[in-house]
Amino acid sequence: NVSDFFNLFPDTVLTIVDSHPIDVAASHTKVAILKHAVTMGEQLILFSEQTQFILSSSADNLTPLTANVLVATEFESSDDAPPVGSGSSIYFLTKKGDFAGIREYITQTDVTLKDASNITIHVPRLIPSGIFKLAVSNNQDILVCLGTDNPNKLFINRWLFGTQGQKVLNSWFTFTINPNRRIKNVDFIGTDLFLVIEEDTHVTLEKLPFESDYKEDNATFEYHLDHKVTEASNNVTVAFNTTTKKTIFTVPYRLRGEMNVVGRYIASNETSTFVDLNGTTQTLKAGTIIKTTNQTDGTTSTIEANGDYRNAKVIIGEPFEMHYRFSKQRITESPQQSSAEIISSRLQLHHFYIKFEQTGFFKVEVTP
């Protein structure tokens, strides 16, 4: 009842009043068991496994007498992952045998015809089955898929709308972490994706920023490291052994691979120095990689380096690799964006030029 949320029964059965609970069925020729509901503007979209419905009202007010559940579209969906809304679209999961797909359900108030385009049509075998969570960032136009078949991998979709509301970019990529770690859940808060990650003995909460041109404080470039901490972070200690002449950095997590200790950018009123093995005090320049001397095998949380770095300003993290595969090259009939591809001839690439500026090391692999 109105203002009585836990009272699910009408006060009288002789008449229907506006304050009674709304109890309306979704009538259809198919079996329609409603699984999920997503609000979109002034509409409530209801999902069954084969049909989408809209909860609407025949009057200005939504009451037991005016409520209607109308059939909107007929698309198969999976109830393994709840649909998520972004802008005027709803993204929901579909099953395709051993693989999964994502459809974008478009709702527009000025258009009565609704549609759900397949945004994985160009990557039909990318996403495996077992997806159980969808997360979306409205600020960054990003959709993240998490499944049980690859618990250490995220499948991420990024889109961009051009003029007149036309989607000009629909790209997919993956984000993979250490195979000994399992992602249990993800969700966005603002532009940051928070991940619950399970290991053999403990669970951690980690953050993956999707902010454009993200940089550390005072830095002119981004450090491409995972699990970044500084010497000033909580639970990070820097100690010096006077016998071995080594600095011991202790971080608040177990080290799973090779770690980098890098001099970080500092404010104008700060200094960053270290003492080498000869006893000479030197300035640690930003971007300088400090050579470490111990191996990290997943059982320790310490990093050792020759010299005294107790007065150094550093950033500590795990380096990672990024792989990019170019899309299939094609020749079109005209330079227009929607022009058809010429398929009556054979395409042979003689040269392929890559323009780059102010980048780090990268390697290009060409497969004949």
Where are these regions (language model features)?
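Sequence/structural signature of beta-propeller blade repeats across diverse families
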Residues: 18, 57-73, 104-120
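Beta-propeller domains
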Residues: 1-21, 55-64
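Short coil-to-beta transitions that initiate beta-strands within beta-rich domains
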Residues: 18-39, 71-87, 123-135, 178-184
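Short, surface-exposed beta-strand-loop junctions and turns on beta-sheet-rich folds
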Residues: 53-54, 59-62, 151, 201-202
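Short beta-strand elements that form the blades of beta-propeller/WD-repeat-like
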Residues: 1, 35-48, 53-54, 81-95, ...
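Catalytic or ion-translocation cores adjacent to nucleophile or general acid/base/metal-coordination motifs
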Residues: 59-102
